[in-house]
Amino acid sequence: MDAVEIVATVLVAIVAAIHVYIVILEMVLWRTPRGLQAFGTDQAFADRSAPLAANQGLYNGFLVAGLVWGLLAADPIGFQVTVFFLGCVIVAGVFGAATVNRRILVVQALPAAIALVAVLAAANLG
């Protein structure tokens, strides 16, 4: 594995790790002070929306599963799966930024876009 491939792999792993944290926030910590702070909500809203947050967390878990699958699968499948799931993360981040909070663009979409550029560069250089 050359340096560009290593960088791409690390960046994809970071995107997956970010989403593991989001899963934990949405499924486990939603009603806690950490969850309230992370999403800028109050206790009453968190209590009412906990089932929706858990559902959203589950979907973020699917993104993690896809990114890990892409990292572990042999090419060309690994490359294709990684590109697909990074694209899903980017779309989710852009949509979240447009509909919920612009910060999502930086937290979710930007790291995935950087990772996608690295993955494509590694594929073109390799």
Regions found by a protein language model. Give the residues of each.
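Transmembrane helix-loop-helix
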Residues: 67-94, 98-110
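Juxtamembrane boundary at the C-terminal end of a transmembrane helix
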Residues: 119-126
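Membrane interfacial helix-start motif at the N-side
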Residues: 42-61, 95, 99
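N-terminal signal-anchor transmembrane alpha helix
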Residues: 7-28
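Core segments of transmembrane alpha-helices
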Residues: 56-68, 112
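Membrane-interface helix-boundary signature
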Residues: 1-11, 46-49, 75-82, 101-104
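Cytosolic, membrane-interface loops and tails of multi-pass inner-membrane proteins
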Residues: 27-49
